[in-house]
Amino acid sequence: MDKLKSFITALCFFLTTSVCMAQNEIISHGISTFGDLKYEKDFKHLSYVNPDAPKGGEISFWAFGSFDSMHPYTRKGRAGAYSSIFFESLLEGTSDEIDSAYGLIAKEIEYPEDRSWVIFTLRSEVLFSDGSPLTAKDVLFSYKLLKEKGLPSFRAVLEKDIQSAELISDRKIKFIFNEEVPKRDLINTVGGLPIFSEKYFTDNKVDFEASTLTPALGSGPYILDKVDVGK
């Protein structure tokens, strides 16, 4: 009888603990370290953006120096300014908050209070610029690619901070962070990685470490029309 009571007590403790742990998991459309998110779920536009602004036209930016590459994620060559605009990330920050980030490719994020791991759920409507779907496999591919062949700054951070990454489904991916590292900013770090198309790199046998004037396939709002090297 005593054994049965002990078993029931242990079971109740386990179930209570499990419920508490589940209650401590946060599901949100964004994340902020300092204070609450400014924008609610499904917000239509940022407060400093004019949704009725004229579409089309021409815009010019300037930058110091010259360039001979449109690949900003390799040590080879000198990448042109704004050569990263062809790619999107899971999360995107805003200009009117200190450190908030909202789902871009990701629809929502799930994480515990200690931020020891994070699950990203991707939007089903996100496509690469060639019309192919962007899935969690592309996110995993991009993470591994940057960890193995990316800039030293990417490699160092991903190697030190991330314990593992695993696919849950076509639309879900989980990152588990190393126990011994500070975790406050790690969700933002992973959420800010550029996402590449695994199929594009495989089908075209693209060498990620090579300098090139042809940007890889991305899901961003821009594609390259032409480039004048050094101008």
Model regions: which residues?
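Surface-exposed binding/hinge segments that line
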Residues: 121, 156-202, 221-223, 228
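Short, solvent-exposed loop/turn and secondary-structure capping segments
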Residues: 71-74, 132, 185-189
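N-terminal lobe/hinge region of extracytoplasmic solute-binding protein
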Residues: 23-114, 144, 203-204, 214-225
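Bacterial N-terminal signal peptides
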Residues: 9-18
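Short, intrinsically disordered, charge-balanced linker/junction segments flanking boundaries
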Residues: 18-21, 223-231
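Bacterial N-terminal signal peptides that target proteins for export
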Residues: 1-8
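Solvent-exposed loop/turn segments at secondary-structure junctions
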Residues: 65-69, 116, 125-127, 146-149, ...
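Aromatic- and charge-enriched surface segment that lines or borders ligand/interaction sites
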Residues: 49-54, 75-82, 108-152, 168, ...
